[in-house]
């Protein structure tokens, strides 16, 4: 479909978002607090409804003519918990390879035209050539972060070409933390994932620690709390540091917002410990490491990674982070159109 008007759908663990773009200019964004985690518990109906609702809102708000807009999707919408399972492309993967592996999905109750869904990227050795140990150490999967990479690559190529004119590593904290190795030409060489965000959410809502943090979203960070939490994790482990949240409550050492900050810092410290042990960081001492995500978490990752690696660290501006996935998906769609995929 030859068009300059796009709706880019992106589904994650906890949210579904639709971005309306004209070319590379973002016009509007709508979101639903529904993700594939809801589908795991309630089949696919929550995600189907969320996607349909996002599309309906944009269509009505902007009087969109269906035949004049291309609808594309990425992220977990292309998984077995999303709209349809689109097989991963193996790394190393170029944007052209991912664009060429797109799948057209149709459900008239969601949108009256087919939606093009892009696959994710899988990292790892050939299972037939290695044992389970090698697979566990090296195998990984991602859906959605590849579009963030190519969206960032597009934006930074225009604004700060010196950053992406060399190999770089992206760390993107979220429900899951992704570390991605990227070539100077945008080729994705692999990914490495942890469960940090979801683990923090589970700890503060589904364990005894809930009594100590009260599911608080107000966190009073300080250099002392962040550094001490990291020290305990790096010397004694996350499980000990996490339980001290309860100790700090019972003994009155920290108030509720400080306890929440302690627990958050401890999980991030464990995450940074895992990232820093990966060969991309412990062998490439001069690697360029770009950190995305929201500003607060980003600052904590930058602080801790400076202590655990010798990489050159660049904190990405929020303007680059906010719409990277949508711009990357449009980049894939334009490649797909150009090559007749």
Predicted segment positions?
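Adenine-nucleotide phosphate-binding core of ATP-dependent small-molecule kinases
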Residues: 231-274
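Phosphate/pyrophosphate-binding loops at sites that engage ATP/ADP/AMP, CoA/4′-phosphopantetheine
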Residues: 53-70, 159-160, 272-284
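Short glycine-rich, Thr/Ser-proximal phosphate-binding strand/loop in the N-terminal lobe
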Residues: 6-46
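Short beta-strand-loop/turn "lid" adjacent to the catalytic site in phosphate-handling enzymes
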Residues: 61-139, 184
């Amino acid at each position: 479909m030859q068009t300059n008007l796009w709706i880019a759908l992106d589904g994650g663990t906890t949210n579904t978002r639709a971005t309306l773009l004209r070319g590379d200019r973002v016009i509007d964004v709508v979101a639903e607090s529904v993700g594939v985690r809801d589908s795991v518990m309630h089949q696919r109906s929550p995600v189907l409804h969320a996607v349909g609702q996002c599309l309906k809102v944009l269509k009505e708000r902007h009087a969109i003519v269906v035949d004049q807009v291309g609808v594309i999707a990425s992220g977990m919408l292309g998984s077995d918990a999303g709209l349809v399972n689109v097989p991963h492309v193996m790394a190393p993967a170029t944007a052209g390879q991912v664009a060429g592996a797109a799948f057209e999905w149709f459900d008239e109750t969601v949108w009256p035209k087919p939606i093009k869904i892009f696959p994710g990227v899988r990292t790892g050795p050939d299972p037939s050539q290695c044992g389970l140990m090698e697979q566990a150490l090296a195998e990984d999967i991602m859906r959605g972060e590849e579009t963030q990479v190519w969206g960032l690559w597009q934006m930074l190529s225009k604004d700060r070409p010196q950053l992406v004119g060399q190999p770089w590593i992206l760390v993107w904290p979220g429900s899951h933390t992704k570390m991605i190795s990227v070539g100077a030409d945008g080729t994705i060489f692999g990914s490495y994932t942890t469960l940090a965000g979801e683990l923090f959410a589970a700890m503060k809502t589904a364990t005894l620690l809930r009594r100590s943090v009260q599911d608080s979203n107000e966190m009073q960070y300080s250099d002392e709390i962040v550094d001490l939490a990291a020290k305990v994790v790096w010397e004694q482990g996350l499980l000990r540091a996490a339980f001290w949240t309860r100790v700090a409550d019972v003994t009155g050492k920290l108030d509720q917002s400080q306890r929440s900050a302690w627990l958050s810092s401890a999980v991030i410290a464990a995450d940074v410990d895992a990232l820093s042990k990966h060969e991309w960081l412990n062998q490439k001492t001069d690697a360029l490491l770009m950190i995305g995500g929201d500003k607060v978490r980003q600052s904590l990752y930058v602080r801790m990674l400076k202590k655990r690696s010798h990489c050159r660290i660049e904190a990405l501006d929020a303007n680059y982070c906010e719409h990277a996935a949508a711009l990357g998906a449009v980049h894939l769609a334009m490649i797909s159109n150009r090559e007749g995929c």
